[in-house]
Amino acid sequence: MKLGRFLQKRLYGGLVLGSFLMIIKISAAHHPNARVPEGTALDRYVYQSDAHFEYRLVRSMDAGKVHVHVLELTSQKWLTADEVDRPIWKHWLNIVVPKNVLSDTSLLFIGGGSNKSDSIDEPDEKLATIAAASGSVVSELKMVPNQPLVFADDGEERYEDALIAYSWDKYLKTGDDKWPARLPMTKAAVRAMDTVTEFCSTDKGGQISVRDFVVAGGSKRGWTTWTTAAVDKRVRAIFPIVIDMLNVVPSFKHHFNAYGFYAPAVGDYEAMGIMDWQDSPEYQKLMKIVEPFEYRDRLTMPKFMINATGDQFFLPDSWRFYYDQLEGPKNIRYVPNGEHSLRDTDAWETLMAGYFSIIHDLAIPELEWESASPGHLTAKVTGASPKAVKIWHADNPQARDFRVDTIGRNWVSQDVLPTDASGLNYNIQMDSPEKGWRAFMLEFTFKHPKSPVPLKMTTGVYVIPDTLPHLDNKGSL
């Protein structure tokens, strides 16, 4: 039986193990897990005490190999009732506890969703699978950010990027540190970790010790994955997903110079006039608060970035603006033919395999690469021999644009052999197309005997010819 149907039956069919309510207040006045409590406005906001912080156990149920606990988490108060219609942030927090717990590291997946409905958001089946396979607690935090929100001087219901763009506009015009929505989004994730640790230590939670976390999330929640790691020492590793925008200013100048316009996916920022602030001191101050690249000296934990070659927001060669400057263990994967949602791809297996490797101390292979000249790519693997290596490429004869919306799912692959008997060194030469542009990358597949699924990683994506057709245009974000 699928978990979703099982939960629906258990939640509403009378077979719930516990339908009691439990409210526990947790003090955040002195937080021992802060990396730099007074560092930036982000640090100060996250670790500012908030009497609204509490959780309520709504349901507990037996789901085969796991116990599932559904909690309502109140993470904070952001702004006032005079400024926004819903200042108190509430979330569903689904905690999946395997019956055989093997690790005190836990996965926290930061998710989205709407606060418009009172119905319980069911745990994602894939996350329950990861919990059972890994022998670790896996949690899913929903409604990050709380949405929709209606701001008093605006009157519109704002979701996702429209909400964030509005908050940026308020900061840029007022300079008030309270405005960037990344602050409450990050605080929600930190409070979720507090809640998981506290709840799991109770009788109802199974008296389980949760010592540290691997944090993951996609898009806006991928950005929050980075900032959560920047502020909290419990974060052991991160999997930021489809948030290929670190070092955002040069990255989005590159975006405009490649396209000659801003992709519709970032239209909410353009509509709010955010583009016009790019080179201003105000924008630089905003980036000091919310931009993960500004915290890179803190982000030394293992990090595995999962991106899409056909993302509607970000160019596939955006890695060039940040990857080499990240410190500590790092890997990246561009999912071929993936778009921003990563729907109908095997991206979740990368999260599962990578997480499994981290919590069970299985060495993740290291991949180094360089391109000495356009079209030339060398790569070296250490730590394990790949089971398969492919070169992927896609062409666009009309534009330097590889979005799925533009070229479809047109990436194709062929096998690549190593250059020597070690099986660890690879060297390829990709020719430029007769017309237009070609994007390409190398993909490596590894299979550890103790891991339930393969682990894939790639080089960064390269584009040939390495030219920007709209370099002389004026663009900003």
Residue ranges of predicted features:
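Cap/lid segment of the alpha/beta-hydrolase catalytic domain
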Residues: 112-115, 138-190, 245-258
